Amino acid sequence: MESCARSASQMSSSSCCRCSSFNQKLKQGGIGGGSLPVSFSCVMIGGGGGRRLIDQERGKVRGRERKIGELMQVRASAQGGLLNLGNLLFNFKGGDPAESTKQQYASTVTLINQLEPQISSLTDSQLTDRTSLLRQRALSGESLDSILPEAFAVVREASKRVLGLRPFDVQLIGGMVLHKGEIAEMRTGEGKTLVAILPAYLNALTGKGVHVVTVNDYLARRDCEWVGQVARFLGLKVGLVQQNMTSEVRRENYLCDITYVTNSELGFDFLRDNLATSVDELVLRGFNFCVIDEVDSILIDEARTPLIISGPAEKPSERYYKAAKIAAAFERDIHYTVDEKQKTVLIMEQGYQDAEEILDVEDLYDPREQWALYILNAIKAKELFLKDVNYIIRGKEILIVDEFTGRVMQGRRWSDGLHQAVEAKEGVPIQNETITLASISYQNFFLQFPKLCGMTGTAATESAEFESIYKLKVTIVPTNKPMIRKDESDVVFRATSGKWRAVVVEISRMHKTGLPVLVGTTSVEQSESLSEQLQQASIPHEVLNAKPENVEREAEIVAQSGRLGAVTIATNMAGRGTDIILGGNAEFMARLKIREMLMPRVVRPGDGGFVSMKKPPPMKTWKVKETLFPCKLSQKNAKLVDEAVQLAVKTWGQRSLSELEAEERLSYSCEKGPAQDEVIAKLRHAFLEVAKEYKTFTDEEKNKVVLAGGLHVIGTERHESRRIDNQLRGRSGRQGDPGSSRFFLSLEDNIFRVFGGDRIQGLMRAFRVEDLPIESKMLTRALDEAQRKVENYFFDIRKQLFEYDEVLNSQRDRVYVERRRALESDNLESLLIEYAELTMDDILEANIGSDAPKENWDLEKLIAKLQQYCYLLNDLTPELLSNNCSTYEDLQDYLRRCGREAYLQKKDMVENQAPGLMKEAERFLILSNIDRLWKEHLQAIKFVQQAVGLRGYAQRDPLIEYKLEGYNLFLEMMAQIRRNVIYSAYQFKPVVVKNQEQQQKGKPDSSNVENKRIGDANLNPVSVTESPSSDSPQNT
C-alpha cells in the first residue's frame, strides 16, 4: 500500500481527480460486484505543516478493491483480537451477563421443561381448565412465584397449539425477568411479543388486570390479535384500546384480564378520569401490573414531553397572522438569533425596533398587548418547526410527526400558542389557543404501577437512567441463536449531497445482487427526496412514512420488506416493533388476501377507519397490490376463500359490521387453534391453506436471500442516541439470519452541526470535497463525542423534567385523591364539615390572630367577614362571642361549631325542598372548584418554573426555589378550594324547574316539582352563587 504526502495545492488537484473518478462510478450505478457493502477507505491524517491524505485509490478499480479488501481483513482481524482480549478481561471481571442470566434461571427452566410432557397430554378443554385451577391457587394466597413453572408450561403448550410456536428456553427466561419487575434486553427477532404473554398470563390470574403497553395503535392491535389468541384460548379476556374508541368500549376493554393499549392512550385516559364529573365517565381500573414493549422508547425517548390535556382559551387569531408576516420578513442574525440546541429564539435590538414600528406599539412586552409571545412563536415556527420534518399538512390541519416513531400524533397539538403560529405560517385556519387542564410526565405516570417491567432490544446503554429514575434493573437475556449480522464502518462525507449520492449507489449495488434493503431516514422530507432519486435511477421501492397513504399500507409494506431485491425507505416507523422476515411473511400475506376479499363485503359503508374529525373519510377498498403476494392463488384455494367469505356474509350480514368488529372477527379467523363457530372455522381453514401455499414460495425465496447475504440496513443519519441507531440496525440479523448494516453520514447532519462543536467545524473546513468519503480515528472520536454530548444533554433534560415534575406530582396526587373522594363518595357531609371548620379557622386567623389578647379582638370586623361568607350567621354579635369565649381557643371552638351547624342547617333546608339534591350540589361544587383552581395553579406554577431559572444568577438553586414557591402556591390553592366550596354551599339555593312538557302546555305541575331530579349530567338548572374568588371577597 502506497502513501504520498502532498502540498495544499497538490491535495486540491488530487482531490478533484478522485472526486471526478468517484462521480463517474456514481453514474455507473455501482462499484464492482459482490454482495458485501463497498468499503470506502480514504484516510485523513495530520502531521508536518498541514494535513495529508493517504490515498488507497491507485491502479485499476479492481486492484483498488483488492487492496481495500486486504485492508478490511487486516482491520477485522485486529478488531477481532481486541474483541477477544476485551471478552477475556470481561470474563475475568465477572463473565458474560447473558450467560449469567441463563445460569440464574436454569433451574426454573428445567422445572418448566419437566412439566411439558404432562401438559402436552392434556386435551384443549383440559388445558383451558388449568387457568381456573391456577386462578384459585392465586386467589387463595399462594405466591405467583410458586405458580410460575406450571403457568409458563401451560402458556407454552397453548402457544404451540394456537400459534404453532413453542417458546424457546431463552423466551421463558425473558418472561421470568419481566415477572420479577425488571427490564429484559432481548435482541430483535427473539420473540419479545410472545415473551410478554408469559408474565401477563401469570399476573392476570390475580384478577387485578394487566396492561401491555406498546408505542402505537398498529402494534397494540397486532399484538392483541396475534399473541392475544393464546390468552383467549386459555379462557382469559383480552382487551384492546384504540385511539377512536368510545368511553363505554374503553371501560369494557380495561376490565379485561389483559389489555393491550398504547402509552399515550393509557396516559390520557388517566388524565381524563381525573377530569370526570361522574363515576359513569371513569374508564380505568386500579393499576396492578404493566409490561411495556419498547420500554426505552416510552420511558426515555418520550419522557421529555409530558402528557397534557388542554381546554380552549380565547385568543385573537389576527395576531398570529400578523406575527407570521413579520417573522417571514425578518432575517436571521439581523432581527433574531436561533439556538437549535436549546430550541429557542431571541429577538435582537433591530428586531424589537422594526416589530414595534410595524405594529405601532411602544413595547412588545406591554402586558396589555403581549406581542412578544406572538412574535417569538412565529419565529420558532419559521426556523425550528419544519414541514414534512416536524409536521405534515393533511387537508387544512397541521398534524405533528413524532420525532422518535415517525408517526402522526393524531389529536395532539403544541401548547403555548406554538401550534397556532405554525397554522398561521402555513395559512390554514387557526384554532383557538389552549390552556392546560391536566398534565403528567410519563415518568411519574408509570411509577404509579405497583409492578412495572419492560422489554426492548436496546436498554443496556441506558441502564443507569432506568435504575436511578424508575428503580428498574436491566437484565440481558441470551439469544437463542448467535447473532451474525455484519455492522460495517460508517462512511462520512463533508456535505449531504455527497452522502445521498453514495446512498443511491449502495442501494443500486445491493438491489442488483438481490439483497433486500431497508433505508432508515429521519424525516418524511428525506424519505420523499430519496424516493425521487431512486425513481430517477429506475430502482423499484416502497416508502413508509407518516403520509396517510403510506401509513394505511404499513403492514403490507413491512410484510414484503424481506423479499428478494426489495427496497424499502422508511422513517423511524420501521425502527421499532417490526419483524422483517426474509423471503416475506407468508401468514401475513394470507391474512391480507382474506381481508382483501372479506372486508368490502361485511364493513358498513363510510366505516373505513378514523381519518379526521373535520372531513369525511375516503372510501376504502382494502385492495392490496398484486405484487405483494408471492404467487397467484391456486383455483382450489381461491374457491376455498370465496366459499368462506360467502358464508361469513350470509351469517353476519351484507356490509353490517363496523371496521373494528370486522377486524376482530378476522383476527380470530386467522388463528391456528380449533374453532367452534362454523364461520370462523371455515375462514380459518381457508387461511391456513393459503398460508401453506404461500409458504412454499417464501421459503424458497428466503433461501435465496440468505445466500445473497440477508437484509442490508442503511442508516442515513446518526440519531440522538446510539440506542436508536442500534434499533435500526436490529431490523437485520434476526434469529441467527445473516445481514449487514452501514451508516452514511455527513458533517452537515443536524446532530453534528448542532452538537459537534469546534472539532466538527474544523473538519468541515479541512475537507472541501463533497463526494470524498472520509475515514479517520480522529473523525470517529469527534462524531462519537458529538453523539455522547447529545445523549448527556437530553438525559439532563429528562432528569430535570422528572425533578420538577416530582414537585408537581405530590401536589397532583393530593388533588386527585381529594377529587376521587368527592366523585365516588355517597356521603360528603364529613368533607364539607371539615371544609367549614378549616374555613372558620382561616377567617379567625386572618382577622384576629392567635397571639392577640382578648382586649384587642376586633369582633365587629370578624363578624362582618363571617356574615359575608354565610348569611346563616347573621345572629352573631360581638357580645355573644365575648360572653362565650375567654380565650382564642374558645373562640376557635365556638366558630367551628357555628360553621358546622350552619352547614347542617343549610343541608336540612335544601333536603326539605328537594331530597338528594344537596349531595349532587356538593359534588358539583367540589369538582368544579378543584378543576378550576387546579387549572389556574398549573398556569401559575408554569410561570414560576420559567422565572426561577433566572435566580441562578443570584447563586440560588432554581429547583429549591421552585419547590418553596410551588409549595406555598399549593397550600393557598387547597385553602381556596375549601373556602370557595363552603361559601358556595352556604349560599346555595335550589331553583324550582317545571316539567318541560307542562311548560309547553301552560299547565301547572300537579306532582311535587321540588322532588324531581334536576339534570344528572349537568347541574346548570341549579342556581349556584358565585364563589368568593369572583363576586365575594376572597381575602379572609
Curated annotation (Swiss-Prot):
Enzyme nomenclature, EC number: 7.4.2.4
Subcellular location: Plastid, Chloroplast stroma; Plastid, Chloroplast thylakoid membrane
Molecular-function GO terms, alphabetical: ATP binding; chloroplast protein-transporting ATPase activity
Leader sequence segment: none
Reaction catalysed by this enzyme: ATP + H2O + chloroplast-proteinSide 1 = ADP + phosphate + chloroplast-proteinSide 2
Keywords: ATP-binding, Chloroplast, Membrane, Nucleotide-binding, Plastid, Protein transport, Thylakoid, Transit peptide, Translocase, Translocation, Transport
Top-level class of the enzyme under EC nomenclature: translocase
Residue span of the annotated presequence: 1-76
Membrane disposition: Peripheral membrane protein
Gene Ontology terms: biological process: intracellular protein transport; protein import; protein targeting
GO cellular component, one term: chloroplast thylakoid membrane
Keyword Chloroplast carried by entry: yes
Residues binding ATP, per UniProt: 186-193
Polar residues compositional bias, start-end: 1020-1036
One protein family per Pfam: P-loop_SecA
Keyword check for Metal-binding: no
Organism superkingdom: Eukaryota
Region annotation Disordered: where it falls in the sequence: 995-1036
Family: Belongs to the SecA family.
Job description of the protein: Has a central role in coupling the hydrolysis of ATP to the transfer of proteins across the thylakoid membrane.
Name of this chain's protein: Protein translocase subunit SecA, chloroplastic
Organism: Spinacia oleracea
Gene behind this protein: secA
